[in-house]
Amino acid sequence: MASRFPKFSQGLAQDPTTRRIWFGIATAHDFESHDDITEERLYHKIFASHFGQLAIIFLWTSGNLFHVAWQGNFEAWVRDPLHVRPIAHAIWDPHFGQPAIEAFTRGGAPGPVNIAYSGVYQWWYTIGLRTNEDLYAGALFLLFLSVIFLIAGRLHLQPKWRPSVSWFKNAESRLNHHLSGLFGVSSLAWTGHLVHVAIPESRGVHVRWDNFLDELPHPQGLEPFFTGQWNLYAQNPDSSSHLFGTSQGAGTAILTLLGGFHPQTQSLWLTDMAHHHLAIAFVFSIAGHMYRTNFGIGHSMEDILEAHVPPGGLLGRGHKGLYNTINNSLHFQLGLALASLGVITSLVAQHMYSLPAYAFIAQDFTTQAALYTHHQYIAGFIMTGAFAHGAIFLIRDYNPEQNKDNVLARMLEHKEAIISHLSWVSLLLGFHTLGLYVHNDVMLAFGTPEKQILIEPIFAQWIQSAHGKTLYGFDILLSSTSGPAFDAGKSIWLPGWLNAINDNNNSLFSTIGPGDFLVHHAIALGLHTTTLILVKGALDARGSRLMPDKKDFGYSFPCDGPGRGGTCDISAWDAFYLAVFWMLNTIGWVTFYWHWKHITLWQGNVAQFNESSTYLMGWSRDYLWLNSSQLINGYNPFGMNSLSVWAWMFLFGHLVWATGFMFLISWRGYWQELIETLAWAHERTPLANLVRWRDKPVALSIVQARLVGLAHFSVGYIFTYAAFLIASTSGKFG
């Protein structure tokens, strides 16, 4: 019996039903709930799994490099980045007939291939890779790293190599090493790579290990550094006529503050980026020496937190008790990390298109759309996860005695005020935004478009103007041509910024109007409602007015029937589950908005977005319906085309999404009855009844079925939009 799955739970291993399998999978990573877990073993397992995670990441990136080198067209693309379509990898499919082979043979390939919409070609090109040999070398190096990390993970589970629990709880040392080592040193190393390899390569100078020590990155070498004449490194930058990858129009500067974009590649200046990373390295290297470790110098984090008490004591005891609460709760730490990472991932989405860092990526429209959408969805999942682990912290790790009257306790004490404020904000945003949209729809339907309510986003336009956008005529700060900031901007700092912000062909501070105002508030509704559900789920995780004793029921309890006044949908897990639907909904609006605004910008018909985005029928007809025509046309009487695979994925995505409802809208009794019937029929059918199973089949629990439904809903939703996005964009722009 002991050898049955799951080994970590004897209780589950002895369960006679199929619950053993599903609960086993569900709790496999909930180390805290395992039979023989100790605090030390918990930390060791998590530590080892981090090495495994990194090994998988290195293996994955190695695979990208390897497949492009083997089956891609990187060298051909490097010769003509704007006209050669980058190949991700070859497709081998025995079902392909001649029409399919012809449809998918692209980019100068000998057979069917997938086009890369990930931006890796532009990335590798920008950082100085030029040949397939470079890609193979990178792939082998990352494969080697992957193996090293797998060995390291295994090694740190051995008795001699296991760190102690006190090592894991040494917050000051960890923070110092992460700030100086992870951010500081790696940023410095990246500056070095940009200065020694990428910038010379962009100027036609090929630097590799054989000539690395002979080619000076700057004509004067290190002399300006040691003599304090650092401004020499910024003199003679690349000219506006510079051809990327050649010496034509190239300068000698390595650390600049030009601002704006390289005219040919439409990406940030490499020398600006090197300068940026050097500054980051400097700041973080200093930051990593702030906290007290071996030598008794520097700050104690506990002292800092204990000192954070509001003046007069009227707002409680501030941060007292927080240090030990956070340092002893892995869920709290994970919640903080996920919240930070989620926000950063969303910022990456916003900045990758508005300030493109990679050469020629701004002209690869499908890649721009794919990367924006990808990073926003990832951000959504990570951010909801932050609240999930915040709720688990409150259930498992929060000790009221340790946190009397501090910020945590006060959050819990006035949770009703927080929740009700989020509620009225959501209601206000929702009803007003929908009201405006519906009013405009009715006006269009009755043929009086001039009676629409169209509100100019004057505050947002003012902010854009303050940053230098002159279109709106606000004449303020950087857009005021007579002001000192404007004059300084032309020479002292970022002279290219003002040109970039007033160039209507890029995505930097796009021109905005009433359609943007409305969709902004629709997105604000989605964000506030998602936040409301997540915050309420976390703050009510230990107990609520209806059910004061939730703590003992744990994180994911299901309905407890009508006897307790009905406890459906009030566990912290239920709140997370509901919030994910709202998160997907919100990111749907975000990506619809971004994509529609950009395809009209790229096609040169911004009037379509401006005129049609002010009413709901405009969104349905001129964005969704109009752009799905390529997908619906994937198969037609003339055979197939290169969009057929996306047409199929569009259909398949809808199927997966719709399957989710089968789990979401039917309850346990239905499934249990169906299973009993099928099992009965199976046992009485000749031949079929030769196959028996050990576990009695039972229906999934309510919580499990909701998870399965949510997973199908999410995956189907994203699959469907991915197919729509890639097909509609690549169908227009190739």
Curated annotation (Swiss-Prot):
GO function term, MF aspect, one: 4 iron, 4 sulfur cluster binding
UniProt cofactor note: P700 is a chlorophyll a/chlorophyll a' dimer, A0 is one or more chlorophyll a, A1 is one or both phylloquinones and FX is a shared 4Fe-4S iron-sulfur center.
Binding site for [4Fe-4S] cluster: 559, 568
Sites where the protein binds phylloquinone: 671
GO cellular component: chloroplast thylakoid membrane; photosystem I
Principal subcellular localisation of the protein: plastid
EC number, as in UniProt: 1.97.1.12
Family the UniProt entry places it in: Belongs to the PsaA/PsaB family.
Listed name of the protein: Photosystem I P700 chlorophyll a apoprotein A2
Taxonomic lineage from the root: Eukaryota, Viridiplantae, Streptophyta, Embryophyta, Tracheophyta
